[in-house]
Amino acid sequence: MEEPKCLQREMYKSVMTENYQCVLSLGYPIRKPEIVSMMEVGEELWSKNDSARPGQKEVEGETPKESDWAAENCKRAQMHKEVLDLDTLAAVKSEPVEEGSNSAKKSHICSHYGKLFSCYAAVVRHQRMHQLQKSHHCPHCKKSFVQRSDFIKHQRTHTGERPYQCVECQKKFTERSALVNHQRTHTGERPYTCLDCQKTFNQRSALTKHRRTHTGERPYRCSVCSKSFIQNSDLVKHLRTHTGEKPYECPLCVKRFAESSALMKHKRTHSTHRPFRCSECSRSFTHNSDLTAHMRKHTEFRNVLNLDSVVGTDPLSSQNVASSPYSCSKCRKTFKRWKSFLNHQQTHSREKPYLCSHCNKGFIQNSDLVKHFRTHTGERPYQCAECHKGFIQKSDLVKHLRTHTGEKPFKCSHCDKKFTERSALAKHQRTHTGEKPYKCSDCGKEFTQRSNLILHQRIHTGERPYKCTLCDRTFIQNSDLVKHQKVHANLPLSDPHTANSPHKCSKCDLTFSHWSTFMKHSKLHSGEKKFQCAECKKGFTQKSDLVKHIRVHTGEKPFKCLLCKKSFSQNSDLHKHWRIHTGEKPFPCYTCDKSFTERSALIKHHRTHTGERPHKCSVCQKGFIQKSALTKHSRTHTGEKPYPCTQCGKSFIQNSDLVKHQRIHTGEKPYHCTECNKRFTEGSSLVKHRRTHSGEKPYRCPQCEKTFIQSSDLVKHLVVHNGENPPAATAFHEILIRRENLTRSEPDPYPCTECGKVFHQRPALLKHLRTHKTEKRYPCNECDKSFFQTSDLVKHLRTHTGERPYHCPECNKGFIQNSDLVKHQRTHTGERPYTCSQCDKGFIQRSALTKHMRTHTGEKPYKCEQCQKCFIQNSDLVKHQRIHTGEKPYHCPDCDKRFTEGSSLIKHQRIHSRIKPYPCGVCGKSFSQSSNLLKHLKCHSEQNPPVALSSELGFVAETQTHPDPVDHIVYGDTASYISPEAAGERSFKCNDCGKCFAHRSVLIKHVRIHTGERPYKCSQCTRSFIQKSDLVKHYRTHTGERPYKCGLCERSFVEKSALSRHQRVHKNESPVLNSAMEQQQVTYWGESKDDPNSLVPQLHVIKEEESPHIVNAYSPLSILQSYFPPILEPKGTPRYSCSECGKCFTHRSVFLKHWRMHTGEQPYTCKECGKSFSQSSALVKHVRIHTGEKPYPCSTCGKSFIQKSDLAKHQRIHTGEKPYTCTVCGKKFIDRSSVVKHSRTHTGERPYKCNECTKGFVQKSDLVKHMRTHTGEKPYGCNCCDRSFSTHSASVRHQRMCNTGRPYQDEEYENSLFYSADITWKGDYAQLLQIPCGLEEPMKAIGWISEVAL
């Protein structure tokens, strides 16, 4: 009986497995039934005690009963029947799955998760899984499960139990199936084979996913962008790109990741743990993918030993095999993977099977064709979430994202420098290692980059792939072809000399290619000079040389350049000059492939390769490449300066130096840039300038790879790395190499033995050596200051004599040095020759560009030794160090005040002298600082010039239609009216609200209002601020610092504006009290009696009868927003008058806030309750009502307040301070509002009028209460009887009566007993009292009210 049961069980297992395999073979995504999982791991299916299954335990101590076991088996059988119904399978088989079909052909969608199916029966079967009851609930996380086995597996995630252990590596697993899959990594078993490509897998799920690559099935679709995925996990990861969710956070550096695997890889960067070890060579890896790639080196090499015929090389050495098992027989390049090797071989066969249908361009790989095709379609599927920039390749997006994150993942192990790309790191590391991996097979020369090797090899092969279409001349580099083609622009030049030199001189071994040239040279040795000049008796060997010499006396220059009109005495000089315009260099060096414009320059250059120095100094035996260099050098020994200037008497060693000097007097600039038409006095300056257009930077720093246009900039930069005295070996090695490549030959440099610095000339070296010996031989007789060089002394003496020999022809301003004049003239011409390559910003001086470039590179080379703070400029470091030393070297002689900076002293002295040297050319207004003038100039529009207007009074200009509160502008006789359309340039616009600003910095601060960004955080209370200045002010609340002190009462203030407001109390200049003045004094600009062309401040008294004309004082609101208002005297007099109530204000901001009281404008709205406010500060305070925030605590009693002003008033209760005094009766008050209310008892003023009955009130709150008598509003309700009241006090009295049981008066009866009366004061606080009808004495009313209130 037992044997048939066993056979029946085996048959059941076989049928179930076959049915499940059938479904999988169709490519249908089906959830694996639990019974199939049990069969795969070898569990018993018919055990009556489920707890006896291996790996399962009893849950909460319960043992399943036999009835439960039977019900469970029935339930499972029903599930299997539903899932594996043969009729359904037949329906599935009836719909053939086409190869390459995708999810778009699956029209049946699951309503729960959106999963796609090819037939309706599959959807029905799938949806039954959602309808199953989840009866197993996890007590830890409330998760539910349909099957008990899934519930038991889930519980192990909470308990950490891993009952299945691998006997090979001791690794543990929660499920037996996971252990079986893992063991296949040791055995190498891959039992699941793809029928299409025969690829094998160790897990069935991997085969299922792989099958979808053949069928094109992508069952998981994104509901946002409709993109489909093969796996559900890929869809989950993709959805995070839409939501921005990064749920995995690193506990060490708080960095977040979208995937857990990325977090695991990242965590290993914090530790040295390498958990993945190679079993063959014991090498360890941080990531499993690295180990997998490494393992292929071992497994693929075993295969490559049998593929010698394919590889085409001899057996590889063990060293090469360990790294790259596949070697190319043509170029000897090695590869780690077979596929990469096959792709590479196609580059030699030039087979490009993938053709573009648009341009017929061929590609080796299909992926390259896909990327190329996007250049035609414009598709950029990879978009940056920060700036929405699109990219064709994902790798480009990854590199781009690093510009936003600042991430530089590739770090140099030598200098800790970081790079965004691995290739940049590889190139950089070669500067440390000196590695030159690209070696020439012909001459053994090595190069750091492959591109340089390719160019070099063309010297050996003779390959010149770039051909001129006009003259068939060929070139090694494309850049040489481009330069050559400029020759054909206008003038045809002669062919270059050949390299053949058959004629050799027996005296000096010089060779010549032409016989005539050789004969001319021979006469130099014979000394024969039969052609003599009649003027100076100088002799020449040839008549042509005499003709040329005579032109020196006559000044004749018959050869003229057609482009720049420059003339020359010889035709050869014209030809040489013409090459400056064409850029042609017809004389190439075959050693280094450098080209030259002249043959003589090539001969001199060639000596740098051979080391030949034929011209030696008889004094110091120093050798020189050129004879002219020896002649110049000899004058350093003799002190001879044979070339004097006829205008200033200055002498020079070289004639070229004299020519350059004379251009200072004549103003000649013969060197012309063809790009920007700029002219220069020296050819070297033009060469340097051209590099700003071409971007060439030939001088490279050997330490940081930074490049420079000039060698002097490199020398200055090297000080950053090596300090003030850089070693010669590291600092100037690169300079010497570049110097060999200069277009002109130069004598050997003079190195300093102290610091290794190199100089071109010996006098420069001698001057430099004095800096080490601290020898200053040139003292000043005026101030005893000494200098190293006499030129420095001459410049310094001009500061005493006041001599400024260099004058500007535009403004006649004088300067001590010519360089200062050159810089100044650029302010007139607008020339900015130094352009930033990053943002195209232009600068007048090179030093300004250098400083600006550091804002892009982040370089701060000047570090403070005390606090390690770094600065971009050395001057900033000097100023900063004064903070530590407390030094204030700049002293005011008038008030003995000291300053850390000279500019601060200059600005301060203008307070004493009242000098305002910066006048506005439009309106004549003057300013003490240039920055204020620049801000003011933006108020004037260039499109609408000012038009002078006048009235009968001579100073009032009226506007026609302006709804703004102020309608007039008051100026002097020569004042100009600026229309609202000319309201200043505001070129920076906010994209959110359309508001415009004159300065970019103001726009940046404004944008933070929309974004909510508050980058400045307080370290004491974690409060944040939009501006740094606000943080500084706030920090004083913690430190107690009050830097602004009143000179009259010794009171201190946190802000300067608070001090200004306080000082008005002493001067009796309250803007509120000034509104009652019968006449006002206004200062305006008028003509001076002494000089009609100048504007001076004039005082005008505005009388009572003139007030109708000027009650709407000074200027339209639109102009106020872009204008500096007219100067008002005396200081503190109100400048802004309200046209509605006549009230005057000193500050425009206070006036604008006041004006909103009349207009009712409330632009600031609360998002919580919709309430609006006229001021942003009121909104901020209101929001704290919702949040409950009270950031201002009292240090005495601990009570907190929403506003700082409330805290200040509260603290006066503890101190007893009453700083506000009534000027009439001398009574004192705690706050200013109390004294204002009190002052109305003297004046009888009632500013708050009721629109219904014209009744007046002293306080606005009384008006609000009164208005409820008209509207009937009763906002205060009783909690006991639902009765409502119009005032809070009435509600409080009523609730007391409800609580105590005492009767209460009817509110209408109470209101009928009262009428509004004068203000009566009790104690220190003003209270508005309502007097009962018939009671004349207010004090009796006070007693009556007190009695009722009790």
From Swiss-Prot:
Alphabetical list of InterPro entries matching this protein: C2H2-ZF_domain, KRAB, KRAB_dom_sf, Znf_C2H2_sf, Znf_C2H2_type
Keywords: Cytoplasm, Metal-binding, Phosphoprotein, Repeat, RNA-binding, Zinc, Zinc-finger
The name this protein goes by in its record: Zinc finger protein Xfin
Tissue: Expressed in oocytes, and in specialized cell types such as neural retina cones in adults.
Zn-finger region bounds: C2H2-type: 108-130, 136-158, 164-186, 192-214, 220-242, 248-270, 276-298, 326-348, 354-376, 382-404, 410-432, 438-460, 466-488, 503-525, 531-553, 559-581, 587-609, 615-637, 643-665, 671-693, 699-721, 750-772, 778-800, 806-828, 834-856, 862-884, 890-912, 918-940, 988-1010, 1016-1038, 1044-1066, 1136-1158, 1164-1186, 1192-1214, 1220-1242, 1248-1270, 1276-1298
Gene3D superfamilies the UniProt entry points to: Classic Zinc Finger (3.30.160.60)
UniProt source species: Xenopus laevis (African clawed frog)
Function per UniProt: Binds to poly-G sequences in RNA. May function in post-translational regulation processes.
Residue ranges of domain KRAB in the record: 1-58
Superkingdom of origin organism: Eukaryota
GO cellular component: cytoplasm
Pfam families: zf-C2H2 (PF00096), zf-C2H2_6 (PF13912)
